[in-house]
């Protein structure tokens, strides 16, 4: 599906203004905010793009000036952070991603008077560093339950999850998805009287950038009968969706099932609005924006800030989220109002085809998570991922 990939690249260039070099934005001497991205980079349709979205919203709403610094390899993290700090030009320097943790710890010590922020890190404990973490396990439990129940409804007995590099933060996604699958199986049996026995296929691809590996992993899962594929690898989701699209085309279909489950951003608008059933929205944009806002209003405080379902940091995608991201595409000039209508109509039909009780059940689990009645395993917390795999098996 070369056309699909080229189309996605064109969308990203128009919306996000992809950069070829390491720096973009205002002239360095005039900037106040530096955003240092990980190797996944812009154009991933999820994690890094959401980080940039939050910074761009701060530009629009708070009047800050932004320099975006791309990391082309892991070797770039330390010098990128050091160069930004050494310039003395920035009120805050934000690292987007777990992979920057070691470099951020070193640079925070080297420049004690510089304010820093980092996403997906909560253990560094530096007096000049705001650490922003997310309850990905809770959001993944919601889409895990949805995946199991929807798969069973459509006659599938497997769901899949395609992950990136095997790191602790991704264990949180896996742990929650496993819990959700088991919860969804139990709820389906309770409502229908039939035990669906939906099982899990999972693959740590070892990359956040090789789209072909995402596609290959998804193809293998589809061949084994998976009805849902959860993307937990940023841009590899482009490959996941390519595989699903080609699988459907081979059957003379354009709409799922099988479906993809999106991650981080709202990815429901991809696949013409009828091949991504839902997205586990991890609001990296909210985290980046809140860090910048704290500097603007003078409330910056070092330490750990956790974002989850209770404070807007984690959510399963809803219709308004779809509308917001369609607006974003229209603003970038890559879709039109006519596209809005077809994407929204396809999405509405896709969602309506899933029985209402399944969506109600997802809402029930969400309420139980919020109240604390449902305790979702974490993965990198005291309960290890090995124990969780035993407790909530494939």
Which residues are covered by each model-predicted region?
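Aromatic (phenylalanine/tyrosine) cluster motif
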Residues: 3-4, 16
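Hydrophobic helical h-region of N-terminal Sec-dependent signal peptides
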Residues: 9-17
């Amino acid at each position: 599906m070369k056309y699909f990939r080229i189309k996605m690249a064109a969308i990203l260039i128009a919306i996000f203004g992809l950069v070829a070099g390491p720096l973009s934005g205002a002239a360095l001497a005039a900037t106040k905010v530096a955003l240092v991205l990980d190797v996944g980079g812009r154009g991933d349709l999820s994690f890094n793009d959401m980080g940039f979205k939050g910074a761009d919203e701060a530009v629009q709403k708070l009047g800050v000036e932004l320099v975006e610094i791309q990391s082309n390899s892991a070797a770039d993290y330390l010098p990128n952070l050091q160069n930004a700090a050494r310039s003395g030009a920035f009120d805050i320097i934000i690292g987007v991603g777990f992979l920057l943790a070691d470099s951020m710890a070193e640079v925070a010590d080297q420049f004690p008077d510089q304010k820093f922020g980092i996403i997906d890190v909560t253990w560094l404990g530096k007096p000049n560093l705001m650490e922003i973490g997310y309850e990905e396990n809770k959001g993944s439990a919601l889409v895990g339950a949805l995946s199991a129940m929807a798969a069973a409804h459509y006659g599938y007995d497997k769901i899949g999850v395609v992950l990136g590099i095997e790191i602790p933060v991704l264990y949180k996604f896996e742990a929650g998805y496993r819990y959700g699958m088991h919860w969804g199986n139990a709820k389906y049996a309770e409502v229908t009287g039939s035990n669906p026995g939906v099982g899990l296929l999972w693959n740590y691809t070892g990359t956040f950038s090789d789209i072909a590996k995402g596609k290959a992993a998804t193809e293998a899962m589809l061949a084994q009968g998976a009805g849902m594929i959860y993307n937990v690898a940023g841009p590899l989701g482009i490959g996941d969706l390519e595989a699903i699209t080609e699988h459907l085309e081979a059957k003379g279909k354009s709409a799922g099932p099988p479906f993809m489950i999106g991650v981080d951003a709202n990815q429901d608008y991809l696949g013409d609005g009828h091949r991504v059933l839902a997205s586990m929205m991890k609001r990296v944009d909210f985290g980046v924006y809140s860090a910048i806002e704290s500097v603007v209003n003078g409330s910056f405080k070092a330490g750990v800030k956790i974002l989850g379902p209770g404070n807007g940091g984690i959510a399963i995608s809803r219709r308004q989220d779809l509308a917001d991201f369609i607006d974003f595409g229209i603003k970038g000039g890559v879709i039109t109002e006519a596209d809005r209508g077809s994407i929204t109509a396809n999405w509405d039909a896709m969602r309506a085809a899933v029985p209402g009780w399944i969506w109600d059940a997802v809402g029930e689990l969400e309420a139980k998570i919020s109240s604390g009645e449902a305790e979702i395993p974490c993965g990198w917390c005291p309960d290890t991922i090995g124990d969780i795999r035993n407790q909530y098996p494939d």
